[in-house]
């Protein structure tokens, strides 16, 4: 995702930018907690400053004549010859990349091991020429940059790429461009750079299930602006070095936005105006529907893009893009351009937030409110061995390790798999059932592996002016909606939330992989949203969210054209799959929540059947979920076969 920035102008990297520069690497060794994260960062920065030589304001020419600005860090006291290079291609400040976030730990390791590190700004950002438009040109610019590096007299002709969030998203098209010098890639939390892949088509996470993700109003206000002060064309490097001593091109005084009230603005295409935001792509994006042909101009990584470089994906269960990220791993495993690339697609999935890996883990890693146990992991070690193998030819066994290493929440252990989804799973349907009143956790909603014999239904009212509040989840960089796993028990007291729960489990149930969702809906309106949330309920009643999904019902038949509902008619609605890895322990219960809103994580459907983005007068929806023999509303859980699926009856 495009990481956010601190609205207070500073000359250090904003906190949320540091989040986006943090997720990197993995081996099963858990590092000792002798130093805090802040201490390790300080030590890494000190090492970089002492042991590297910096070449700033390098002007890298693109094929269209635009020059991109780059800083190169060389290992000190070593000959500048036959050097492998790691490229970080970013829209953020170079100094923030070096001094903040886990990138400092990676850069230190690269310098220690004899690598050059090149940090280059994408076009239109800071001292790079051109106009910033998200991901437009990333494939060509990435190819040209790798070509430039490979031709330098100090290069060994091999380039690795690494990044989290924006600097990972840029790698999709770069990898698909298949420059022969692009030897290995490490994209982390890169879903905002993904278009159509597998069951997902989120236009780079702008949408989920056709609903706008609220985080983008925050990100485009603080980081995604299109214009900035610029300089005369064709300044020399020496002139740019002099200029850069006086300006760093970062806004000094950015007014703090009142997001708490702004997110309630209707129509939503007035939110950026009301915030007083600088012009950005958001001014255009917010006025598009998912089937707008203009989305095709953005260079999302998608089906048809076949990676040329071996790729190590690093993701997290509470990343806003976890579904597309996992789907991209699966796609490239089957479709990468060469046998070498296909056989060397690896993935690590942590239990943390977007780009948080390596920053928050302790013996008791808390994500939101849930203790995930000891989730520490040597990310730097794995990435270093990955690049040593592919850029230096080291025979270190890194490619002989399991293809997937994913953290199982609940059990709080790292697990390894040869494939994803794992082979030893059974797809087990869990059916929604009730006595006609599943409203709130006090209702009679049931979740059962037995298909209901009796037709029943549950009705609720969705009022867009009183939506269900978002609480945690797969979200990033959005102050009004922190991400992670939170106790949902309070929200489950609302009558506009349908709650379906299993009996208490007598034995553990391990759920690993994609979770299919099919609901049968009738409504009095032409269009509405359906939301679903998977929850782990402990013996103490705390109900921790695992993943959630949404679908704007007009898109239930695909993204080509909307199909509206007729009042009272029952429709099958397949929500894009959820994905998780969680062990439901004996004594716990599996729960599903169904509603029509999760705000401000997703924009509110005004239920009119109109564009939604330019409307301000909502219609109240009376939505009915049907279940029974003719309408088997259900979720399908991927359950590990070696663990019993029995529940108390």
Regions from the PLM with identified roles:
Residues 323-345:
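Active-site-adjacent alpha-helix of alpha/beta-hydrolase-fold enzymes
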Residues 313-315:
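Short beta-strand/loop motif that positions the catalytic acidic residue
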Residues 112, 176-178, 184-306:
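Accessory cap/linker subdomain of secreted extracellular hydrolases
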Residues 77-150, 199-200, 206, 358-370, ...:
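Cap/lid segment of the alpha/beta-hydrolase catalytic domain
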Residues 235-270, 357, 362-649:
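C-terminal, loop-rich substrate-recognition/catalytic regions characterized by aromatic stacking residues
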Residues 168-179:
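Short glycine-enriched nucleophile-adjacent loop
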Residues 154-165:
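Alpha/beta-hydrolase fold nucleophile elbow
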Residues 41-78, 501, 505-507:
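N-terminal cap/lid segment of alpha/beta-hydrolase-fold proteins
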């Amino acid at each position: 995702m495009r990481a956010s920035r601190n609205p207070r102008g500073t000359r250090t990297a904003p906190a949320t930018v540091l989040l986006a520069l943090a997720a990197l690497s993995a081996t099963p060794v858990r590092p000792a907690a002798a130093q805090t994260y802040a201490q390790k960062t300080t030590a890494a920065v000190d090492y970089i400053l002492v042991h590297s030589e910096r070449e700033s304001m390098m002007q890298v020419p693109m094929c269209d004549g635009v020059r991109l600005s780059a800083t190169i860090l060389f290992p000190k006291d070593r000959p500048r010859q036959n050097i492998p290079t790691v490229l970080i291609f970013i829209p953020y400040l170079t100094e923030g990349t070096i001094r903040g976030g886990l990138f400092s730990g990676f850069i230190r390791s690269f310098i220690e091991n004899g690598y050059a590190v090149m940090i280059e700004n994408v076009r239109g950002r800071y001292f790079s020429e051109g106009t910033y438009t998200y991901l437009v040109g990333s494939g060509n610019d990435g190819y040209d940059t790798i070509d430039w590096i490979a031709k330098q007299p100090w290069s060994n002709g091999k380039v690795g790429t690494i990044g989290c969030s924006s600097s990972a998203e840029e790698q999709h098209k770069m990898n698909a461009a298949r420059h022969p010098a692009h030897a290995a890639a490490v994209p982390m939390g890169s879903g905002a750079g993904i278009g159509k892949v597998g069951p997902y088509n989120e236009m780079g996470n702008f949408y989920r299930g056709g609903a706008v993700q609220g985080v983008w109003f925050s990100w485009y206000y603080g980081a995604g602006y299109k214009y900035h002060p610029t300089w005369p064309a064709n300044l020399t490097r020496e002139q740019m070095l002099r200029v850069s001593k006086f300006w760093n091109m970062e806004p000094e005084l950015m007014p703090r936005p009142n997001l708490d009230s702004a997110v309630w603005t209707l129509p939503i295409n007035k939110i950026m105006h009301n915030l007083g935001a600088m012009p950005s792509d958001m001014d255009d994006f917010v006025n598009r529907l998912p089937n707008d042909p203009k989305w095709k101009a953005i260079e999302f990584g998608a089906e048809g893009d076949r990676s040329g470089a071996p790729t190590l994906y690093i993701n997290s269960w509470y990343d806003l893009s976890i579904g597309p990220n996992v789907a991209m791993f699966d796609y490239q495993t089957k479709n990468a351009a060469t046998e070498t690339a296909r056989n060397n697609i690896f993935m690590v999935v942590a239990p943390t937030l977007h780009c948080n890996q390596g920053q928050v883990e302790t013996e008791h890693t808390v994500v939101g409110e849930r203790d995930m146990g000891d989730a520490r992991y040597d990310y730097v070690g794995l990435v270093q061995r990955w690049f040593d193998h592919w850029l230096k030819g080291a025979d270190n066994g890194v490619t002989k390790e399991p293809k997937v290493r994913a953290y199982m929440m609940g059990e709080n252990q790292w697990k390894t798999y040869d494939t994803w989804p794992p082979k030893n799973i059974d797809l087990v349907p869990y059916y929604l059932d009730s006595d006609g009143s599943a409203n709130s956790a006090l209702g009679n909603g049931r979740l059962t592996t037995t298909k209901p014999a009796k037709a029943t239904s549950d009705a609720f009212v969705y009022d867009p002016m009183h939506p269900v509040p978002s609480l945690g989840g797969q979200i990033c960089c959005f102050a009004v909606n922190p991400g992670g796993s939170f106790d949902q028990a309070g929200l489950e007291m609302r009558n506009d939330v349908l709650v379906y729960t299993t009996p208490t489990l007598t034995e553990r149930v391990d759920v690993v992989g994609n979770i299919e969702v099919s609901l049968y809906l009738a409504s009095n309106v032409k269009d509405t949203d359906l939301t679903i949330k998977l929850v782990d309920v402990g013996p103490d009643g705390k109900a921790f969210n695992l993943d959630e999904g949404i679908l704007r019902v007009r898109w239930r038949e695909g993204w080509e054209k909307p199909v509206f509902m007729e009042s009272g008619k029952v429709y099958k609605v397949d929500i894009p799959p959820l994905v998780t890895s969680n062990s439901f322990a004996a004594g716990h219960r599996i729960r599903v929540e169904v509603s029509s809103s999760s705000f401000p994580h997703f924009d509110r459907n005004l239920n009119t059947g109109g564009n939604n983005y330019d409307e301000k007068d909502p219609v109240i929806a009376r939505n009915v979920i049907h279940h029974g023999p003719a309408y088997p509303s259900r979720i399908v859980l991927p359950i590990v076969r070696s663990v019993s699926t029995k529940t108390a009856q």
